[in-house]
Amino acid sequence: MALSDIALCARAQVMIGASPVSSFDEDSAEAEIARLLYPTIRDGMLASYPWRFAARGCWLARLANTDDDRDPGDGSHLFAMPRDFIRLLSLENDGGKITRFELRDRAVLCSADAAWLSYVARLAEGSFPPWFDLALIARLAAEFCLPLTESSTRAEYLFKRSEDQFRAARLADAQQSTPHAIDDFSLISARN
């Protein structure tokens, strides 16, 4: 079942014994805390690991160097990052990986004429897989706990629990594709 941002926050609030919100616009401490913390926590969770379910790729649009502050002057080019960009996984062109680059204010600077970006994207909550939902709910509960319950002991417990859920989510995500095999390693060839 796909969960919305409100549903994720409400489940986290239930975990700590708080009243679940039905809207971020409610006039309650629960709604205010969820509204303020949720986007940052969601983006932080997405950025914390190269999630396969959130991996995207695209050719980047080259920016015109009209602003003197942005023009590197060394033959490098600026490329605009996509709006849903959260984390860079790799940068490539037709010649292979681009190893030297720099992120600058929603753009990437590199010496290539074209660039393919592999990245983690900000997705709609309904497209999160169940294992990520569980990890995000656990993290939200840990983050919401102290401001809503003022219990540092419970918050500490919930942070440990959220780390366990995060590890389980990473494992589940890693199992969503065939593992990379080392086929041409000299020591393996020597054993045969």
Task: Label every PLM stretch briefly.
Residues 1-192:
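Glycine-enriched, solvent-exposed interface loops adjoining structured elements
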